[in-house]
Amino acid sequence: MQAVILLGAVIVVGLVAADWIAFTRKNPRVLGYGLAIGRQQEALRVSPDDFDANGYLPLPHGLAWLCPGQHAIILLPEWKRFGLRFRTAWPLNGALHYDSFSDCTELRFIKRMPWSSALLTALWFLTVAGGLIAYLVSYARAGGFASAPGAFLGVALSGLGLLVLLFGLIVVVAAYRLEDKRLMVVYDELRAVLCEKPSQKLD
């Protein structure tokens, strides 16, 4: 039984690692990979002159990568360049989709999260919530709420379960806000470059 559990844990860790590698790789396929969790639009100048021969534009806190064939710019934050130098379990990347190079083209910005982060988070909340509900149902059927001490114990344990859910929610929200702030810092840095430099090929 222990061997089966160990094998399952190794498989899960392997799948999560593979998911993160696929999510952070410098490949055009990363454009549609992950769970889309945010969208916004803005009109900006887009020119290949801002990027090097490989399509890279180094930024103070990350990298912008131009993919002309996909009409997109990938934003990859570098967590080591921020004040809090650690990566959470909910990293984000972003992709800006455009129709053509222009002095004023509409950019569609999409934020994405790894599938494993979203699925494991949902699984954790469902497990805790499901376990709490199952406990309350079985406790009530066993007559646990029939007496005052039993009712007090049931309410206390239920409150503990709710605190666990609340703590998990706080962690997820705090981590998401941190990663979103990092991504938006890189987005603002790219935006500053696009707004500052005059286009050479389009003028």
Outline where the language-model segments fall.
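A membrane-cytosol interface segment of integral membrane proteins
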Residues: A36-D50, T88-A122
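Juxtamembrane amphipathic/hinge helix adjacent to a transmembrane helix
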Residues: L96-R108, L136-G144, E196
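Generic low-complexity segments that are intrinsically disordered, proline-rich and/or Lys/Arg-biased
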Residues: D49, L59-H61, G69, G150, ...
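Alpha-helical transmembrane spans
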Residues: M1-R29, M113-V185
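Membrane-interface amphipathic/juxtamembrane segments adjacent to transmembrane helices
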Residues: T24-G62
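Non-transmembrane, membrane-adjacent beta-strand/coil modules in membrane-associated proteins
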Residues: N54-D99, M113
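Cytosolic/matrix-facing juxtamembrane and C-terminal tails of multi-pass cellular membrane proteins
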Residues: A174-D203
